Amino acid sequence: MKEMDERKQEGELHLLGGSTVYKQDYAPEVLEAFTNKHQGNDYWVRFNCPEFTSLCPITGQPDFATIHIDYIPDVKMVESKSLKLYLFSFRNHGAFHEDCVNIIMKDLIKLMDPKYIEITGIFTPRGGISIYPYCNYGRPNTKFEQLAEKRLFDHNQ
């Protein structure tokens, strides 16, 4: 509890511990980051988000998915409540499945500048077809750029 109070006092976190306002459309501005206290270590962080929803931009029908977010942090890390509110903001947003995962990845790169990140969307079937889009990013000119290429080429093998 002391650590959270320190982070709130340092101005890093604003949403955690407060009342919740749910945005009605895509809202990247709700994302918050905090300082990684283990910057000397390379390690994975995984978020499993089983209740993601968005709207088909053509039909307006809801799409449902589990979103997996895996990243190797550097200086900044995404705060989980802000991530939850951000993902919730897609609920009334029209975007194709492939767009959703790429938008999420780009917004998280902008927020955190991670060493490596990958996003997988496991969308439930509509019309008898499931779509599982995957995207990734590794920081250019580092071993993480090579990791991104390898994981992309080895994906689903």
Curated annotation (Swiss-Prot):
Q: Which residues bind substrate?
A: 78-80, 97-98
Listed under catalytic activity are: 7-aminomethyl-7-carbaguanine + 2 NADP(+) = 7-cyano-7-deazaguanine + 2 NADPH + 3 H(+)
Q: Name one GO molecular function term.
A: preQ1 synthase activity
GO terms of biological process kind: queuosine biosynthetic process; tRNA modification
Write the record's keywords in alphabetical order, separated by commas. Answer: Cytoplasm, NADP, Oxidoreductase, Queuosine biosynthesis
Pfam families referenced in this protein's UniProt entry, alphabetically: QueF (PF14489)
Question: Does the keyword section mention NADP?
Answer: yes
Q: Which residues act catalytically here?
A: 56 (thioimide intermediate), 63 (proton donor)
Q: Where are the transmembrane segments?
A: none
User: What's the domain of life for this entry?
Assistant: Bacteria
> For this protein, what is the EC number?
1.7.1.13
Its GO CC terms are:
cytoplasm
Q: Which pathway?
A: tRNA modification; tRNA-queuosine biosynthesis
Subcellular location per the Swiss-Prot or TrEMBL entry: Cytoplasm
* Described function: Catalyzes the NADPH-dependent reduction of 7-cyano-7-deazaguanine (preQ0) to 7-aminomethyl-7-deazaguanine (preQ1).
The text of the family note is: Belongs to the GTP cyclohydrolase I family. QueF type 1 subfamily.
Identification of the protein by name = NADPH-dependent 7-cyano-7-deazaguanine reductase
Q: Which organism is it from?
A: Parabacteroides distasonis (strain ATCC 8503 / DSM 20701 / CIP 104284 / JCM 5825 / NCTC 11152)
